[in-house]
């Protein structure tokens, strides 16, 4: 990979296939005894391949270009949701059932923290933003929301090798959330991207910005004593760790601390096995993504057999929607941990 990225080594079809079929879950990093940063190696290699137009087809570039155009994304998402209801949307897109109505956006209440709303998360799971706001209200924290220039973190662009586009989006995100207030993110993929801006941009300002970023659970968990009377859920909850929360941010334990305040936590026995969503991977490699998902579903079913739990929590929109496609028919619901926490508020 370094030879391709740095020295322009020849690229053949076999090499491209290897890179294209990597889900970029980064599960190899904690397993590697030498600590090789495979994630950054893959990103650098994909950047070199993208420059050669060997990967990242034109339709994918077009789709990614729509992400920062928030109104266009919202309109397109509504059209896709309607197409799903009419059975006109191909399942190979790898997109779970989208909401026809998403309700109002979060209204800022102050400036204690920033709540990063993102692009896909706001278009497809806006309820989770409103529930995050409810939790912050209960804790007694005010929040600001970035403007439209900070609506896309660039994570998918980075994964696709589109570094120039990712840098441009990162600069917009940083400009949209100035100051020193903490930045809370309720999407694991977005949080990992924002925390990596120091590496992406290589500036002191970007490193200071990245140091302000927290996954919402790691920030909320030590502050939940401010809400002492949470209502018990009444059933156990299976926790599924998004790869970018567990392997990249290493912030998966606070999810258990949050969920454990109102429900019994049920662990999976797969040591953080990827679910196969991988950002855009489920759309680009639907067969492989489906095979990976079936392995994950098998571990969830084992947890269900042990505990009777019919609720799975996952703190990333891609993971939750990808899993819900397979688990809905089995009577298992996939939710965001913050949604359950909001339901437990007194």
Q: Where would I find each of the regions flagged by the language model?
A:
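N-terminal cysteine/histidine-rich coordination modules
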Residues: 1-17
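Iron-sulfur cluster-binding electron-transfer modules in prokaryotic oxidoreductases
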Residues: 38-346
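Cysteine-centered iron-sulfur cluster-binding motifs in ferredoxin-type domains/subunits
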Residues: 12, 16-36, 272-273
